[in-house]
Amino acid sequence: MISVTLLCVVIISYFHYNQLPIYNLDLALKFINNSTQKEDFKSIAEKLGYSSDDKLLVIHADDLGLEESVNSTSFESLKKNTVSSASVIMTTDNTDEVANFSDLNPSLDLGVHLTVTSEWNIHKWGGILHDKDIPSLLNNKNHFYWNKRKFTKYTNIDQLYNELQAQVDLAISMGMNISHIDSHE
């Protein structure tokens, strides 16, 4: 059985390479299986009732879970509809707040903010998995590397795969209704 993370990475890469929109997993799979042609795609604007020429602005709240102030400000903006969507860093200590908010707001456009770096001076985090299971992703303090250069130099692809899958699995196990996946940094 193919995992959610691997499937998303393959589909997103394929669609990005072919410059195709990705907003519907069933449609994506049909296209990959050659049962749907590019001409059958409607833009997100068209699916929302706008014309194909209309431009839409999506305002996205990044880094939910980082700290209480980020969560409360983002929650307020989501409630007021000044922010359209958000994504949560699953490797922080404040994800319970996001899970509770998600439970109270089931129509929330909430994604997992896949995280494998820890660039903040004040906020440091490691992975969801135990340190011994992802040593290539961590520095000598068991935090993710602070920059992408070290991350790409030392990372073991199997450990990376397992950590990303664990982040998605944790969000689902906490009852978050995940609509998308994006990445930190």
Predicted segments, located by residue:
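Acidic (Asp/Glu)-rich catalytic clusters
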Residues: 48-49, 74-80, 95-109, 127-139, ...
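A short alpha/beta connector and helix-capping loop motif
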Residues: 68-93
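Catalytic domains of cell-wall/extracellular-matrix polysaccharide-remodeling enzymes
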Residues: 156-185
